[in-house]
Structures are given as C-alpha cells and as structure tokens.
C-alpha cells in the first residue's frame, strides 16, 4: 500500500516560500498553513498538534517547517512501533537545514536527501 502525498506544515507566512520550493520537488505534496497566520496555503488548519497527529496516524509523510522539538513533543505520545512510522522531517524556515526525525524504515533519509538537494544544502 502506498503512502499519501506529503504534507508540508507551516506556522507562518515566513515559511511559505520554502514550503513552495519543497512542494515543487514532491509531486502531489500540499502546503498546510496555520489559519490566521498563513495566507496562500493549499489548506489551512487551526491546531498544529491535532493536525500533525492526524497526519501521522494517516501515515502521511510530514515535512514541518518549524523547530524539531515542537514536532517531537507533538508526536511523542504516538510513538509505538518503529516499523510503522511515516517519514517525519523538520526543515528550517529559511531552508538552511533538513533534519530527518522519524521513519527511518519508511524512507525519511531518502526524502531528506531529495529535499536537501533541491534546496542546495546537505541533510543533517
């Protein structure tokens, strides 16, 4: 069974340009922006934690343009089985870093390499 297309989750307009650059690298990926803080996202959401947890439970690869700690704390209660994790990455808002967080068996390192190459940087 194939995974859904990746979700690029952003918290503010400052991340939108980087999110769109990543989206160009990943056919079918969508940009999800925080309602009231992001204009021009493909879809909006109102609660970061609920949204990221729902994406994770739906096996959707997650590319979060925010601090890695926010993503880790959000998903910590759901981390049960390493083999069943979708890829989860944190990307710096300014496109200076790509950090694979979860989903080593699910292709997170390959996804990190694709994104990093497209942004002209090395993955962490």
Show where each model-derived region lies.
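Generic secondary-structure signature for well-ordered alpha-helical cores
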Residues: 24-28, 61, 80, 84, ...
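Short, glycine-/small-residue-rich phosphate/pyrophosphate-handling segment
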Residues: 96-124
């Amino acid at each position: 069974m194939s995974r859904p297309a990746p979700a690029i989750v952003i918290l503010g307009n400052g991340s939108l340009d980087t999110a769109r650059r990543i989206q160009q690298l990943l056919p079918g990926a969508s940009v999800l922006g925080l309602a009231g803080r992001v204009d021009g996202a493909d879809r909006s959401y109102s609660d970061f934690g609920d949204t990221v947890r729902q994406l994770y439970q739906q096996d959707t690869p997650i590319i979060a343009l925010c601090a890695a700690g926010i993503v880790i704390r959000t998903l910590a209660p759901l981390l049960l089985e390493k083999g069943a994790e979708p890829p989860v990455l944190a990307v710096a808002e300014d496109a200076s870093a790509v950090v694979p967080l979860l989903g080593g068996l699910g292709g997170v390192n390959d996804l990190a390499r694709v994104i990093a190459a497209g942004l002209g940087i090395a993955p962490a």
